[in-house]
Design a protein with these regions (language model features):
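Membrane-interface helix/loop boundary segments of multi-pass membrane proteins
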Residues: 102-128, 157-164
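Small-polar-interrupted transmembrane alpha-helices in polytopic inner-membrane proteins
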Residues: 57-61, 122-137
Length: 195
């Protein structure tokens, strides 16, 4: 499971979960510091862009995952095995935002900014960033690696063109929140997907 209880005591588990998620927030904050505070403020329009990007990646991504799993080309990803129901949803939402914050700030905003400053062209920079993103998702299976490369290409292209990172953070948050909380709400029953 991607998210498991770290302690039998609910309060200790909650503290450990928040501290672990805090590491991802710290990575993003460090990247922002190294960029000398180049961080655009969120705009209301970013919510719409984020929802659109989440749908473009999330809906086909779910179909791709279900097909790959059905054909035996990937492994089943269990988003949560948390055992404290009253903290499960807040912890999963915190992890969703931490993942989005850390990945989009570091792997898209920081990395693409630095590669551009080093004179990399758009194709090389997007390929490098996307393959990096895909590679650290391979523990979820080959289909997750490929899907994250595609996600990285789209999100990287969007950032390269607009310089806006908030739509990416929102989109990533929505994808993870739907996957994590949706799985928990369904009690792990994904038979309606044919898997």
């Amino acid at each position: 499971a991607l998210h498991q209880s770290l302690s039998n005591a609910p309060w200790i588990d909650l503290g450990l979960q928040l501290a672990s998620a805090g590491t991802l927030f710290a990575y993003g904050a460090l990247a922002l510091y190294l960029l000398a505070g180049q961080f655009p403020r969120p705009r209301w329009a970013d919510i719409g862009w984020g929802a659109g990007l989440a749908a473009i990646i999330g809906i086909p991504g779910l179909a791709f995952y279900a097909t790959a799993l059905h054909l035996g080309l990937t492994r089943e990803v269990v988003p949560t095995a948390l055992t404290h129901p009253w903290t499960e949803v807040p912890v999963l939402l915190t992890w969703s935002f931490a993942n989005a914050w850390g990945e989009e700030i570091v792997v898209v905003m920081y990395l693409l900014t630095r590669l551009r400053q080093l004179g990399w062209g758009v194709a090389g920079a997007l390929a490098f960033s996307s393959v990096l993103r895909g590679s650290y998702h391979l523990y979820q299976g080959v289909s997750a690696g490929v899907g994250n490369i595609i996600m990285g290409m789209l999100y990287g292209w969007f950032y390269w063109r607009t310089g806006r990172v908030w739509p990416l953070i929102i989109a990533h948050f929505l994808i993870d929140a739907v996957a994590f909380v949706g799985y928990a709400a369904l009690g792990g029953n994904l038979s309606w997907l044919g898997i």
